[in-house]
């Protein structure tokens, strides 16, 4: 084992990751949480949270061939407990070609995801939709989006986790082959797509499946990131304690997985030390649960931008003060292929395993606070857009506002209305008006002008 380890480390050290690009936050655009999408309504329908409310940016991608952006909604309002036809929004984002200042997005088309038999994919969890926790069926929680060379939509799902290919109009084509070690199973090997630990003993954590998806620049490979470590990996075989998240490589043509790499989250001890005076530190079991990945987008065939964040900030629940919203640049050059390698039993990597190289790219929290913006909890979309007149590149980041909907322990849904000035909140019946002075949580787009030429 010594010689392979030396070789791997030598490769990693011989090919240092490039320095960060120069990121400038240009402006921030908020879209009201009550905004409707472009779904055609039947006669008599007036619209509702789970029918046509804009679900914003669980992921975001840019199509250079058309100049349009695609905004992915997730499983809908209510955390998988109410009916919702899953979808992607084709949008136009006006921008100034010299400065990168963006305006309000305009939805051009709402695209529903349809199965082979014409049935719409649905955000309901498998138990509610299929009456069977072991049957995924048309249950779908879209979280990652990439556009293929032919304009097809590739979507990463959190329930499975799954990756599906659709036509540009949303018609299902195929499912890629997801490695068995990622699939949630009970003791004995029965699939269970609904429950979490301790019922699930192997595979992805509940609500922590695939969270981001990208093609490499050549377009022949796909890379998906899980949000957090697998449920069984880490000390005490508990993923919540681990920093080690899997990046999964797929061959686009065959749909087969070809490799898995380890991405290491920032240590909770580092994040807790940001403000030593606070008492709301991340606990040991929040390391691999409250800190996670939200997006990945390719810079080349081997380098990627990855969005890492905590679960704090403006959202449907009151949280502690946010500490961590960053974009990192990673390289898979020299990283070990851990497909078939267990990371269970320890938070440390096995001897000889080299993680992806990781370097700080931009501190989103600092950039937002420097301009007086409130920090959203769920910054989840990250997309590289067109080149600006001065050679810089327009990069957009977007938020998931959970449709500004929460639910009670009994499974009843409510709209969340917030007064941003004083922080007061109210919960009202779905689709009911917010009290005076309060509004639904908005969707947020952040425009950055990025000088990638500054990278050495």
What are these regions (language model features)?
Residues 1-19:
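Gram-negative bacterial Sec-dependent N-terminal signal peptides
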Residues 20-456:
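Sequence/structural signature of beta-propeller domains
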């Amino acid at each position: 084992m010594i010689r392979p380890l030396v070789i791997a480390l030598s490769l990693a050290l011989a090919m240092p990751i490039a320095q960060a690009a120069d990121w400038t936050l240009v402006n921030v655009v908020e879209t009201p949480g009550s905004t409707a999408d472009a779904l055609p309504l039947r006669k008599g329908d007036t619209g509702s949270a789970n029918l046509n409310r804009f679900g914003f940016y669980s992921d975001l991608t840019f199509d250079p061939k058309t100049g349009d952006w695609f905004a992915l909604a997730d499983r809908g309002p209510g955390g998988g407990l109410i009916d919702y036809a899953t979808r992607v929004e084709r949008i136009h984002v006006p921008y100034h070609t010299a400065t990168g200042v963006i305006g309000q997005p305009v939805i051009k088309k709402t695209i529903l995801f349809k199965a082979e038999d014409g049935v719409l994919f649905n955000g309901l969890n498998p138990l509610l939709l299929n009456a069977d926790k072991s049957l995924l069926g048309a249950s779908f929680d879209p979280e990652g989006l990439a556009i293929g060379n032919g304009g097809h939509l590739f979507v990463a799902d959190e329930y499975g986790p799954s990756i599906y290919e659709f036509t540009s109009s949303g018609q299902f084509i195929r499912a890629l082959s997801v490695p068995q070690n990622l699939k949630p199973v009970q003791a004995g090997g029965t699939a269970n797509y609904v429950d979490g630990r301790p019922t699930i003993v192997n595979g992805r954590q509940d609500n922590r499946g695939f969270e981001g998806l990208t093609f490499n620049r050549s377009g022949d490979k796909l890379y998906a990131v899980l949000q957090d470590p697998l449920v069984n990996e880490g000390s005490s075989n508990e993923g919540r304690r681990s920093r080690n998240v899997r990046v999964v490589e797929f061959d686009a043509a065959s749909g087969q997985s070809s490799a898995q790499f380890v991405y290491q989250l920032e240590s909770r001890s580092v994040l807790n030390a940001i403000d030593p005076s606070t008492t709301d530190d991340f606990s040991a079991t929040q390391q691999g649960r409250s800190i996670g990945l939200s997006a990945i987008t390719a810079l080349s065939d081997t380098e990627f931008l990855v969005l890492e964040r905590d679960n704090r900030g403006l959202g449907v629940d009151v949280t502690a003060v946010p500490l961590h919203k960053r974009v990192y640049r990673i390289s898979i050059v020299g990283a070990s292929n851990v497909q078939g390698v267990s990371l269970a039993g320890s938070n440390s990597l096995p001897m000889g395993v080299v993680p992806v190289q990781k370097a700080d790219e931009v501190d989103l929290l600092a950039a937002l606070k420097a301009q007086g913006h409130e920090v959203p909890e769920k910054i989840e979309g990250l997309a590289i857009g067109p080149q600006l007149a001065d050679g810089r590149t327009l990069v957009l980041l977007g938020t998931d506002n959970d449709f500004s909907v929460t639910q009670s322990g009994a499974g009843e849904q409510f709209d969340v209305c917030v007064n941003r000035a004083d922080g007061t909140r109210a919960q009202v019946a779905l689709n009911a008006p917010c009290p005076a002075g309060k509004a639904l949580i908005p969707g947020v787009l952040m425009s950055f002008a990025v000088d990638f030429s500054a990278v050495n």
